[in-house]
């Protein structure tokens, strides 16, 4: 296995399996480059009871033997927050509470009218206030200046009121435990500290009581999964939607601190358009509840962990922009990450190979690729790189709930999509020791030995560890900062940060996502030599996605930065005004442009870190510096076109390549270039679909070997192997390594209805052919579905988990006279096991070796 430190820590599901099964699963993980695991009840029949502690003791013992890290999933089910049902049983008063509104429409003038108020209150609900406002144009719009508090006119549950002239609406606002997300109704109130304290006592303290001697040693910490407000179901629950709202006992007092006096009378603006003050009220509310989530939920969990010598990792719900909203969201991604020791996300069913534009359906949602492909990973790595306490560490829970159609090929592509945006630790979802096939969100990687591709899993894990190791422990280099949009979204029209990130990355301009809190903290952000400094990073420009409104402190900070020499670029237009503030007036150093002119503007500012000599929108890169070594990770994100391009680097040292698939340093074709007074290197890059490479400056280039990966074979001799005449054998996933003959001798799709449509496992192909005298030769298998292992004349040539299925043939392996080639092709389990809701969302691929197969030689 690779010598790099393991950056893989999968979820390991527990259902109270036999001891031998648990130990075997851990052994298979360790053998395949996995250095840790997260124990998750999924579900465990005796969670927090005797058999749970027994199973954890077994896992802890085996982890110590294997020198593996152990993490503990912090609840009996996901999302985190119910303490396996104990919270509502022991502390029902600490479960979630909401603020709800009921509406009664009234016409005036009308004297001596009364309205039943208590009739709107269910048992255990509390009346907060009764307000009224005048309607505009017979619609659900209200004149904010007419909002009035009528609470003092409520006597014995009845409102007595002389209704003024016009159309009015009476708002009955109450505190309730009803109306939120049904799934999480018994979870702790994330806005109050008492619920989290009880949760810690029930889960964290109980694990500490049993295993405190291993805390900070083998047990490294807790994983918290998708904590949320849960005031309703959905990803798109912006403030202003028809829903109950998160509530805490001190909420009204905190809202009043925003400079609007008795904020209570403006509460209808949280649901309805109440004129000019609506953006301010909504911002104040979201700012308050997201800070309470930050401090009293995730922050309190993290503080407990660090006080007990362990760490807190995990993630919230990010998909489709939920990270900045209520519902499934936590209000503000960067605030929810503040208490964690790593910045986390998940990529579960929401990034697919080649899907980089538009929307697509999955078993969970209609996913937005602009966020899920371009934005989510960059959001996490930015938190990791800019929040000093995270020390550059980000994690992604990945690969789960795709169905068995997802094999190592898709995993490699998804890994590249995450890592080229800075993710450097991966939580594979999942290892399940349950009886095969476990229907719970496949794929499962070992699957009690039934996953045929696990034979090649070590290829993916070694590759991933090499990539992650080379983007860890140093610092990211990016020329641009892009403002996070949550505060803009809360109150007005806006554009999300990921649209800017996408535009920049398609033009090879890397960036970090920066957020208001870190920008306005002058101890964490400053100007030096005309550049914005945050943590160890320096930015030459700040891009602000369109925002109708921004917080006053942020707009003041943007003015300061511009005045100190930082180009601050506003897309589309400047803000209309700040929240609770006056009209926004731009300063010198502030620029305005549209999307079409952003890239030319940035190029005119001479900020680019690398300069491709041709436009290649599918070429993604990530620059990472560790000590004196600079590494540029390049990925071809296209599925069909080879990228061949010259790239200029602002570094005059000799460059080389590092191939993370083979672990080799390779020679690079390059030349020195002069541009004005600058001397740099121009390096030729060739990447086929699914390929990646590091361009490295500062390595000992004497250790480089011949670069066979990028060798051009134009003009070489071509020997095409025939489509027919092959002998074939098959070994099903559940009978391997026993093979039997296949009644087929021609390369074709073996999943055709008249052949082997339900087959999952290994197909062995064998052919004898005449060779030639060759100094060099390259074998190309053409189309393969999907993992290939190749032998030539009894010598193993290599294995490949994804395209391009090209193998360099060592001198002497391709001979004149008779040669024998053997190819084993392993498909995924979806042909035999697609009885789940996930595989039906994939367009199924063929099975087997399709070719054309060629040997290129000279």
Residue ranges and their predicted role:
Residues 178-180, 701-703, 826-833:
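Short acidic/polar inter-strand loop motif in beta-rich domains
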Residues 692-698, 777, 815-827:
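Short, well-structured beta-strand segments enriched in hydrophobic/aromatic residues
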Residues 647, 769-793, 800, 821-824:
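Aromatic-lined ligand-binding clefts that engage carbohydrates, nucleic acids, or primary amines
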């Amino acid at each position: 296995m690779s010598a790099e430190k393991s950056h893989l820590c999968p979820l390991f599901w527990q259902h109270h399996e036999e001891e031998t099964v648990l130990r075997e699963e851990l052994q298979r993980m360790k053998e395949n480059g996995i250095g840790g695991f997260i124990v998750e009840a999924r579900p465990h029949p005796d969670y927090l009871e005797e058999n749970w502690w027994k199973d954890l003791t077994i896992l802890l013992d085996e982890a110590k033997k294997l020198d593996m890290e152990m993490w503990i999933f912090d609840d009996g089910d996901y999302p985190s927050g119910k303490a396996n049902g104990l919270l509502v049983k022991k502390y029902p008063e600490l479960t979630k509470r909401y603020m709800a509104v009921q509406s009664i429409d009234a016409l005036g003038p009308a004297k001596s009218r009364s309205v039943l108020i208590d009739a709107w209150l269910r048992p255990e609900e509390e009346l907060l206030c009764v307000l009224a406002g005048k309607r505009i144009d017979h619609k659900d719009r209200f004149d904010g200046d007419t909002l009035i508090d009528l609470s003092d006119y409520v006597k014995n549950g009845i409102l007595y009121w002389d209704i003024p002239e016009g159309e009015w609406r009476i708002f009955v606002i109450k505190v309730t435990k009803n109306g939120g997300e049904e799934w999480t109704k018994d979870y702790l109130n994330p806005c109050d500290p008492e619920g989290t304290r009880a949760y810690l006592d029930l889960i964290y303290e109980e694990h500490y009581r049993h295993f405190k001697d291993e805390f900070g040693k083998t047990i490294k910490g807790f994983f918290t999964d998708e904590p949320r407000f849960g005031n309703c179901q959905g990803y798109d629950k912006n403030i202003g939607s028809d829903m109950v709202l998160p509530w805490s006992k001190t909420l009204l007092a905190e809202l009043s601190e925003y400079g609007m006096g008795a904020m209570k009378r403006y509460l209808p603006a949280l649901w309805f358009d109440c004129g000019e003050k609506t953006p301010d009220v909504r911002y104040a509310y979201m700012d308050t509840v997201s800070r309470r989530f930050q401090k009293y939920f995730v922050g309190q969990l993290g503080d407990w962990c660090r006080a007990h010598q362990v760490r807190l990792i995990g993630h919230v719900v990010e998909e489709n922009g939920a990270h900045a909203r209520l519902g499934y969201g936590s209000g503000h991604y960067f605030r929810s990450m503040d208490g964690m020791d790593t910045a986390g996300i998940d990529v579960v069913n929401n990034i697919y190979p080649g899907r980089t534009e538009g929307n697509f359906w999955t078993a969970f949602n209609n996913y937005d690729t602009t966020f899920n492909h371009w934005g989510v990973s960059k959001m996490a790595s930015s938190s990791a790189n800019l929040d000093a306490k995270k020390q550059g560490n980000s994690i992604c829970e990945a690969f789960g709930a795709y169905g068995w159609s997802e094999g190592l090929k898709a995993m490699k592509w998804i890994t590249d999509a995450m890592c080229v945006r800075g993710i450097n630790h991966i939580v594979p979802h999942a290892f399940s020791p349950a009886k095969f096939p476990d229907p719970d969100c496949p794929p499962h990687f070992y699957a009690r030995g039934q996953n045929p591709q696990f034979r090649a899993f070590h290829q993916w894990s070694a590759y991933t560890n090499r990539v992650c190791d080379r983007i860890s422990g140093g610092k990211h280099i990016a020329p641009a900062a892009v403002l996070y949009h949550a505060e803009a979204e809360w109150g007005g029209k806006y554009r999300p940060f990921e649209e800017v990130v996408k535009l920049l990355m398609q033009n090879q301009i890397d960036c970090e996502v920066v957020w208001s809190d870190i920008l306005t903290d002058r101890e964490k952000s400053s100007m030096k030599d005309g550049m914005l400094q945050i943590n160890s990073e320096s930015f030459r420009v700040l891009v602000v996605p369109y925002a109708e409104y921004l917080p006053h402190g942020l707009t003041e900070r943007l003015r300061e930065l511009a005045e100190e020499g930082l180009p601050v670029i506003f897309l589309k237009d400047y803000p209309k005004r700040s929240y609770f503030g006056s009209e926004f007036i731009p300063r010198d150093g502030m620029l305005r442009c549209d999307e079409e002119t952003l890239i030319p503007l940035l190029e005119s500012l001479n900020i680019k870190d690398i300069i491709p000599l041709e436009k290649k929108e599918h070429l993604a890169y990530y620059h990472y510096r560790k000590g004196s070594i600079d590494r540029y990770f390049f990925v071809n994100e296209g599925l069909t076109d080879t990228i061949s391009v010259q790239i200029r680097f602002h570094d005059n040292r000799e460059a080389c390549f590092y191939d993370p698939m083979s672990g080799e340093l390779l020679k690079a074709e390059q030349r020195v270039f002069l541009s004005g007074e600058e001397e740099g290197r121009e390096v030729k890059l060739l990447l086929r679909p699914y390929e990646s490479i590091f361009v490295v400056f500062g390595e000992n280039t004497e250790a480089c070997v011949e670069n066979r990966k990028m060798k051009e074979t134009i003009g070489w001799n071509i020997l095409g192997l025939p489509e027919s005449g092959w002998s074939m054998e098959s070994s099903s996933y559940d009978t391997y390594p026993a093979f039997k003959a296949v009644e087929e001798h021609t390369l074709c799709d073996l999943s055709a209805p008249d052949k082997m449509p339900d087959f999952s496992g290994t197909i062995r192909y064998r052919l004898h052919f005449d060779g030639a005298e060759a100094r060099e030769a390259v074998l190309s298998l053409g189309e393969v579905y999907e993992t290939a292992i190749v032998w030539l004349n009894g010598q193993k040539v290599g294995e490949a988990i994804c395209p391009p299925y090209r193998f360099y043939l060592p001198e002497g392996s391709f001979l004149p006279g008779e040669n024998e080639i053997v190819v084993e092709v392993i498909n995924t389990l979806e042909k035999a096991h697609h009885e789940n809701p996930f595989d039906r969302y994939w367009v199924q691929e063929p099975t087997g070796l399709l070719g054309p197969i060629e040997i290129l030689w000279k």
